[in-house]
Amino acid sequence: DSASVMLLKKVDSCGARFPIEFDFSSVRELDWFGGNAAISHWFDAYTLLVPENEAFYIRTLRNLVSSASPDEKRLLRIFFGQEARHGEAHRLYAHKMNEMGLATAPFVELANGIFYGALEPIQPIGLRMATVAAIEHVNASMAHIVLSKDMFRNAHSDVRRLFYWHFAEEIEHKCVAHDFLVRDRPSYFWFFTRYRG
């Protein structure tokens, strides 16, 4: 079975899923990662990129819904739901960062302007699909490292909960974009021509 099929089976066995609620009111220090400011800020920057990144993944894979089988459509719905919740949770934490005095808007506006204002509109869907599949595997690889080593064990418990939950779901759906990407056995030429426009 592919990882995508296993995800369907896991969701079926667990029944309905409910969004996890987060409260970051007790986070009061910017060096929440066990006093390590550098790592804290690295993951803070990651958080700032998550909401629009997740929206990009959803926009990209929505192009596949009309040609998907019933099982594939269910898989896409699961993927969309998980990614949307990731964006909402990280947006909530980003708001907390602003409350603590971090000026996040210039960074977010610059990154989103480059990636989604300038680059996304000129990229064919095949290239966007390849980008999503690649980033999802990077996320899953990072998630395996973080979770297997319990890297956030000394971090603030509420921030740790956010990232461990997010990373667990990244591992869970890491092959969704990849499985759709290779469905038609694409070549490099395909990336620049498929679903162009």
Model-based region annotation:
Residues S4-G197:
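Non-heme di-metal
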